């Protein structure tokens, strides 16, 4: 697998700010280290090369931000959009309904589904873009 296009801290902070501007919520980064940890996880999966693919790495972005809770508000939104942006940057298009996506992220945040389940959700709701 070729090296993916990664989401960095600046990208995640910009996404978070934009999502708060669009949908409201309290601004602010609660813990930079938790954000950095969430953003490093997909890259570690890639380096370990133990079967992780683009979908698993997108899940790692989403789960990392949702569960680490690095922001004061908007962690689920930011985690979801970060994962989807990662997919888009790497040649995939997300096709699930807004309702299905929201439900999956809420279940992930609540612990009702695990990362493998969320990856399965993504796999059935992304298509590879034509080159």
Question: How would you describe each model-predicted region?
Answer:
Residues 1-131:
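FIC/Doc superfamily catalytic core
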């Amino acid at each position: 697998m070729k090296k993916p296009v990664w989401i960095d801290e600046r990208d995640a902070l910009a996404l978070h700010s934009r999502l708060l501007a669009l949908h409201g919520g309290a601004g602010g980064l609660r813990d930079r280290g938790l954000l950095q940890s969430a953003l490093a996880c997909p890259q570690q999966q890639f380096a370990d090369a133990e079967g992780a693919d683009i979908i698993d790495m997108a899940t790692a972005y989403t789960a990392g931000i949702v569960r680490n809770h690095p922001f004061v508000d908007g962690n689920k939104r930011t985690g979801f959009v970060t994962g989807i942006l990662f997919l888009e940057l790497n040649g995939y298009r997300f096709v699930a309904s807004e309702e299905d996506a929201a439900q999956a992220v809420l279940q992930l945040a609540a612990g009702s589904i695990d990362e493998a389940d969320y990856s399965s959700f993504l796999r059935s709701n992304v298509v590879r873009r034509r080159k």
